[in-house]
């Protein structure tokens, strides 16, 4: 036994089950969308966690620059000096260019 009611637009009879399906469709679509976004968000979160835990970020150009900056900061003030490098620490012999014959 089907419930029918007059349609306000056409004046004809509309089946009640169609109205019920149409009324429940937007919330179901919204629920599916929210669940889909949660799953995508969880996947992105897990990928970022693995990326950071495996230290893969160091392989990127920004990661290499970051590591180089950290190393330079740990070296202290001697890293920025412009003094020529020395060959022997005890003798303080200055660095000399060695020319190779052709």
UniProtKB/Swiss-Prot annotation:
Bilayer-crossing regions: 28-48
Keyword Ribosomal protein: no
Top-level division of the source organism's lineage: Viruses
Subcellular location: Host membrane
One GO cellular component term: viral envelope
Keywords carried by this UniProt record: Host membrane, Membrane, Transmembrane, Transmembrane helix
Bilayer topology term: Single-pass membrane protein
Name this protein carries in UniProt: Protein ORF28
